[in-house]
Amino acid sequence: MSASQLQRLLITAAAVALAGCGASQTGGVDATVWQAVERGDVAAMAKNLGGPSLANATNVAGNSPLYEAVGSPDLAVARLLLAKGADANQRNQFGRTPLHRAADEDRLEVVRLLLAKGADVNARDCRGSTPLIAAAEFASLPVLELLVEAGADVATGNHYGRSALHNAAKREDPAVTKFLIAHGARLNQICEYGTPLDLTANSGIADVLRAVGGSESATRSIASRTHKHYLTELPLTK
């Protein structure tokens, strides 16, 4: 695991714990199947997956085999699980679906597959974030384009008001920022850290936002006033 991935994991865990939205874990995935998913061993999975009950079981982290298969380099793993009855919309203990993970990990073909199999493009996790909101922080433009084409709500925010545009501005990606604006992002929506303009330290992104009517919030939070620090680490207190 890279340092950036570890940081993301710790940030997500801390935020979810503070939000109090964890759920109790249920089920228990068969060890043979679980090992096959980890190895990307399609043959072993085909042999040991008896049907939907195993395909939709959960491990100790509350994740389904399909959720874990999103990380496999072999798309055949996810295809087999779906063919065996895996639920494309099954949530883990944080309310995240396989599409949330595929979107924020920039797995374009997995996103395409999940959408084709009925994944809810506007599913909300326990913090209210949709796959598009997650993707805007980490994924490449083609993933966002695919989600929007499938009906993702560009303007929506999570439970704290944070939208895809907030994440794109924080990330400092001009192409993603312009794409979201062109598809109806709300320029001055306020989240706990202010408006999208409050969250960028990049003059180019700031110019793009101002040119179409973006502005800083009138009453900016402590976090938004120190957003340069926020770019690298979410504060654990509000």
Give, region by region, the residue ranges found by the protein language model.
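N-terminal segments that cap or nucleate solenoid repeat domains
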Residues: Q25-E68
